[in-house]
């Protein structure tokens, strides 16, 4: 399989709400292509939705580093920090996102079962 086909497969897993499965497929792609923002974003989102918050934080921070003008990445990082009960730190990133014209995100429904973590 090509990298593109692997990415497409991971996207199918993500769309099917198998976020942990998508993350497993995306992690090696991100390691091989560290500057690819699309891969990094989908990986961070997969980590976030599968409640792998430490990994999501790292991935969103990397995304912010890769694209410092991406207000959505700042908002996503703020959401991740809030889920980790780091509200003061999240406020800084939320303010950056709002300064870039990004409205605060709506609450995200996160469903996680033991099967997702297998």
Locate each region found by the language model.
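Canonical tetratricopeptide repeat
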Residues: 42, 76, 110-111
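Alpha-helical segment of the N-proximal tetratricopeptide repeat
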Residues: 2-32
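Conserved structural position within tetratricopeptide repeats
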Residues: 28-31, 61-65, 98-99
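Register position in tetratricopeptide repeats
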Residues: 15-16, 49, 83-84, 100
């Amino acid at each position: 399989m090509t990298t593109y086909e692997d990415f497409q497969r991971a996207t199918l897993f993500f769309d099917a709400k198998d976020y942990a499965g998508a993350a497993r497929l995306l992690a090696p792609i991100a390691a091989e292509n560290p500057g690819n923002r699309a891969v990094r974003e989908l990986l961070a989102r997969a980590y976030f939705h599968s409640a792998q918050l430490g990994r999501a934080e790292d991935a969103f921070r990397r995304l912010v580093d890769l694209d410092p003008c991406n207000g959505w990445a700042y908002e996503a990082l703020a959401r991740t920090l809030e889920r980790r009960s780091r509200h003061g730190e999240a406020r800084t990133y939320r303010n950056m996102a709002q300064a870039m014209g990004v409205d605060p995100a709506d609450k995200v429904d996160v469903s996680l079962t033991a099967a997702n973590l297998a």
